[in-house]
């Protein structure tokens, strides 16, 4: 029987003394680190652990939201232009969140060399799958043609254009032969991650829910709007974390991004977003138009650029949707008899 008072065997002592050296926190790095990826602490990046802890305060599921009124609104209150907006926003989002899930899980997470970063990213992968469930739940609840909605990204050029651009830029980080000690590969990876954090999640997602929020603000599709509010809160943490990681990599690896490549990223993403806005809002809805959507994208892009120390790509862009930030920070009080009470916290206040 094991006696805890017994001294360890001599060979065990020797094995311990001759084993790997303890992890020195100063040796940890975001990428290209050589410390033990299986040892969580000591933390080099305590902020990453805070993101993980805060994310776990934000738990929700699509089944927490009452969608009964949405069924009535969609079939009896929305006009054709509003249905066009609603369906195509969902068509874009259904594919995008799966793309986001795969990018984090297959391309980014495995390149991190500090476990506190990976642990939050594992939570992020879970949240992206939850978001995909939310879109599917909306589609099922309204009895929409799933095959038709899901295939729109293949047949609608304006939706396909955004997905194609995202695939091209994100696939670069999934190359099996990528060597982050090679300056060219490192630049390519950081540009891919910058696109993901600043554009894909930080601008396209962040701004992309706005057309449905515009319906929600008029008392339409409030259940869907509430689902998207919860998703937006998750996404706000995602892109905030991603931009923080990008900043950390730039500092640790002492690299400067290619200004031409950065400019091309902004211009290409704006062109894709403008084409998308012109399609989904070809007929403006009350209180929201394609011009409104595109201008807000430019304003949001400026904010993301400033976060990583880049010049504003679209100087003078106006904040035409000041209510958008409120959607990511609003605490919701629910009537117990209408839906399950959800105290959706953000934990600590984060700066976007």
Predicted stretch roles:
Residues 15-68:
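Amphipathic alpha-helical packing elements
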Residues 5, 48-50, 61, 205, ...:
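Short linear interaction motif-like sites in intrinsically disordered regions of transcription factors
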Residues 69-352:
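Non-heme di-metal
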